[in-house]
Amino acid sequence: MQTNLLKPKAINVEQLGHHHAKVALEPFERGYGHTLGNAIRRVLLSSMVGYAATEVTIAGVLHEYSSIDGVQEDVVNILLNLKGVVFKLHNRDEVTLSLRKDGEGMVTARDIQTPHDVEIVNPDHVIANLSQGGKLDMQIKVEKGRGYMPGNLRRYADEVTKSIGRIVLDASFSPVRRVSYTVESARVEQRTDLDKLVVEIETNGAITAEDAVRASAKILVEQLAVFAQLEGGELAAFDAPTGPRGNASFDPILLRPVDELELTVRSANCLKAENIYYIGDLIQRTENELLKTPNLGRKSLNEIKEVLASRGLTLGMKLENWPPAGLDKR
């Protein structure tokens, strides 16, 4: 009797638009279409990394409930329009951009001054309209993040440095706009009880639909890999090693450098300054210990905790016989 589960062999990508596609995979054993389709959909909607405007400073504006002479939109509408600009950063996690324009006319995302490693996917997106004599001068902070972050939850390492007039935005980092999936019937030779999974996805253009599905699958693999380490009812990663300080007794994720956590540059540099090079080093530190690190404040701590939680880890964990022998402490 055949006991091996079928694995999908045929993958078809159908482009429905510039940022809209269907990805079909088959064949799956009966039931696996819904099992994997629902998991991929939830990850695509909640856990994709992207870029968004998080803070704005507008010349002559102290708060968002203001209006600007010569600008048709009030500040609230300008901020709403700004949230529709799609940014893509290369080789950096945050950047502050400038937008300066005066005179009658339309202000679009194309008017934002960007360095060579910052891309605006929708340059024709309208931000504001200026009347005769109108002027708009603003600084826009763009950051890398995951999912959705309300502005009232953002914390600053030092409130004293918070400048007057800085407006914090609710940030939707996810590059995925819509996701749905359907399960159809598939056939292999004489078997007709198989599933075909069709995932329909629309993005904002910062990532292709195929890359988004690929990234979501990678996240699922990383999460499920922890279950493969189960041994004796506990995670093998935290069991005492069977050999003399051997790497085999630790979960592979703990041996990865902290750079793979994709933290902001500020957070990553603070950790390296404290000789925290590996994820295994990091999870053994407590919140209080990290807060004593120079230049690492509550905002960075929350970021670290969220990234670790997405991988099933927390601060303050105990690892016996860490570090393993031969681990490079660069």
Swiss-Prot record:
Keywords of the record: DNA-directed RNA polymerase, Nucleotidyltransferase, Transcription, Transferase
Q: What is its EC number?
A: 2.7.7.6
What's an example GO BP annotation here?
DNA-templated transcription
For this protein, the record's InterPro entries field holds:
DNA-dir_RNA_pol_insert, DNA-dir_RNA_pol_RpoA/D/Rpb3, DNA-dir_RpoA, RBP11-like, RNAP_asu_C, RNApol_insert_sf
Enzyme class label: transferase
Region Alpha C-terminal domain (alpha-CTD), residue ranges: 250-330
Q: Give the GO cellular component terms, alphabetically.
A: cytoplasm; DNA-directed RNA polymerase complex
Question: Which stretches does the entry tag as region Alpha N-terminal domain (alpha-NTD)?
Answer: 1-231
UniProt domain comment: The N-terminal domain is essential for RNAP assembly and basal transcription, whereas the C-terminal domain is involved in interaction with transcriptional regulators and with upstream promoter elements.
Describe the function of this protein. DNA-dependent RNA polymerase catalyzes the transcription of DNA into RNA using the four ribonucleoside triphosphates as substrates.
Similarity comment? Belongs to the RNA polymerase alpha chain family.
HAMAP family given in the database record: RNApol_bact_RpoA
What is the name listed in the Swiss-Prot or TrEMBL entry for this protein? DNA-directed RNA polymerase subunit alpha
Instruction: Say which species the protein is native to.
Output: Verminephrobacter eiseniae (strain EF01-2)
Q: Which gene encodes it?
A: rpoA
